[in-house]
Amino acid sequence: MGALARALPSILLALLLTSTPEALGANPGLVARITDKGLQYAAQEGLLALQSELLRITLPDFTGDLRIPHVGRGRYEFHSLNIHSCELLHSALRPVPGQGLSLSISDSSIRVQGRWKVRKSFFKLQGSFDVSVKGISISVNLLLGSESSGRPTVTASSCSSDIADVEVDMSGDLGWLLNLFHNQIESKFQKVLESRICEMIQKSVSSDLQPYLQTLPVTTEIDSFADIDYSLVEAPRATAQMLEVMFKGEIFHRNHRSPVTLLAAVMSLPEEHNKMVYFAISDYVFNTASLVYHEEGYLNFSITDDMIPPDSNIRLTTKSFRPFVPRLARLYPNMNLELQGSVPSAPLLNFSPGNLSVDPYMEIDAFVLLPSSSKEPVFRLSVATNVSATLTFNTSKITGFLKPGKVKVELKESKVGLFNAELLEALLNYYILNTFYPKFNDKLAEGFPLPLLKRVQLYDLGLQIHKDFLFLGANVQYMRV
């Protein structure tokens, strides 16, 4: 029966992680909701895992005293116990408001085979036995919490077990005699099993499951320099209909994590329970990512003449600029130009019902490439555009795509006189549409992972956009090995 305990991680971890100390108490950036439908699916999968596990274990030996008529009191031993077959019919996993989860298994039976010995001072009997255990019922309440590291905790707050019937058939030396007193043997067998089931479950929760939870990573790698923080901001919340797990959801630079000035907004989640799981993802998650990529310089770019299409009317040369910036051509005749773009502040994604948008602002500095290989600054442009964003999610991650609008260019500073900066809009539009945004869309296509266990996939996906957050709904399929 120890497998009942060892199979608990298969049931629970598929729910708890379907997963910084200073973040405790803050608003979550990401919430995972497991509905009653999802809990029942987890119970079903857990029952299958348990049934498979039971057939691979050896039960512990147990001994005791037995009074045999005409022989007297002897010492019995049941050993080499193996589960030959099992049938687990019903299981349920329900939220317990304010506490955690209640796991129950009922109407189950197992058949155990093994060896027996009976010792008396002047003789020893031995043989084999076959035990049929019917009507097994187990109920365990699991208290869920979180520790300062942001990892989940679990304790078995209560446990009860019951066995309706035990039938023992013994063979071997005088096995027929012992079978005459099967009621006494079966009663002892039943008491031993009932007492050990909860003992082994509670031991497994404290010695196996809880230590395992402490090894779970609270960060997940996104790419070569960015990670996402999946630590819990508080203990999982259980209500009558669901279990909700709150994650920090901050994306940060792996090598030098800086304090984030952004705050995650309070998310008012829709009361939806039709799917197995839901994920609420705050704009905080995406905007902390923007801060990291801005800090890394990922948003900076440069444009040189060899990047301009051959049929362009404007080249990045002082000669090409002569018609509208004549002073530039006079001061720097027949020289090439380089445009260096940067984003002064990280662009923030705006969520409104049914819509995603971002309004990036860029500055572009123009340099003349001197014969000495040095660069001479000559003017600065400001570039504004509005961008619509599309986010989707698949079986394991969220991906995105940016669609930019038309750019608007203004001259901010100039050492070569005033000129109409709008003449550069066509050139900048070409670069932004064909190089700058494709680079970002390639990164967004890589996506960032949802807090799922291995071999867990999502299907029947649905996406809603609310103020300040995305709301994703899905059903779950566990891919068995």
Swiss-Prot record:
Pfam families: LBP_BPI_CETP (PF01273), LBP_BPI_CETP_C (PF02886). Keywords: Antibiotic, Antimicrobial, Disulfide bond, Glycoprotein, Immunity, Innate immunity, Lipid transport, Membrane, Secreted, Signal, Transport. GO terms for cellular component: cell surface; extracellular exosome; extracellular region; extracellular space; membrane. Glycans are attached at residues 300, 355, 386, 394. Coiled coil: none annotated. It comes from the Eukaryota. GO terms for molecular function: coreceptor activity; lipopeptide binding; lipopolysaccharide binding; lipoteichoic acid binding; signaling receptor binding. Residues 1-25 form the signal peptide. It is found in: Secreted; Cytoplasmic granule membrane. Belongs to the BPI/LBP/Plunc superfamily. BPI/LBP family. PANTHER family: BACTERICIDAL PERMEABILITY-INCREASING BPI PROTEIN-RELATED, LIPOPOLYSACCHARIDE-BINDING PROTEIN. Plays a role in the innate immune response. Binds to the lipid A moiety of bacterial lipopolysaccharides (LPS), a glycolipid present in the outer membrane of all Gram-negative bacteria. Acts as an affinity enhancer for CD14, facilitating its association with LPS. Promotes the release of cytokines in response to bacterial lipopolysaccharide. When bound to LPS, interacts (via C-terminus) with soluble and membrane-bound CD14. This is Lipopolysaccharide-binding protein. It comes from Homo sapiens. The lineage of its organism: Eukaryota, Metazoa, Chordata, Craniata, Vertebrata.
